[in-house]
Amino acid sequence: LVLEKAYSEGKLKDTPVYLDGMIWEATALHSAYPEYLNNNLRNKIYQNQDNPFRSEIFKKVESVDMRQEICGMDEPAIVLATSGMVNGGPVMEYLRHWAPESNNTMVFVGYQASGTTGQRLQQGADEIHLHDRDKGGMVPVKVNMNLETCEGFSGHSDKRQLMRYLRTIRPR
């Protein structure tokens, strides 16, 4: 929603936003079940107005080849990729390519558990070890990219949302 709003305000005019991994499916759930969203979003979706989850700025990463193309791009891009703890998933490929470059930034939007690569990065690790399938093992990767943490984002429900959901369940 934040990125879609920035785009609609002209702040991300020519910056593509790629969704890689289960993020695409999770975003689709918001459109499929708008009754769990706030009134403003729900009404936009029900009235076929500007559904922020289906904005033209979002591009699905369809293949490993497409991911490699994105990793090799020279122009700015935003990539939302799983896994949140930086212990697997598509984010590892982006990290391998972009960590050494100081003109890249990784933004953490969630909690990083103890012992995870994500936590080590947040704590300022200047080198991490990642699996390299070409070399068949772990290789050191220098971390020169910028690292930021943006609190307040979560893919999980808060207590109020969980309680509201529980009230709707009807046992069989």
Task: Kindly label every feature range from the protein language model.
Residues 1-172:
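Acidic/His-rich, metal-assisted hydrolase cores and their charged scaffolds
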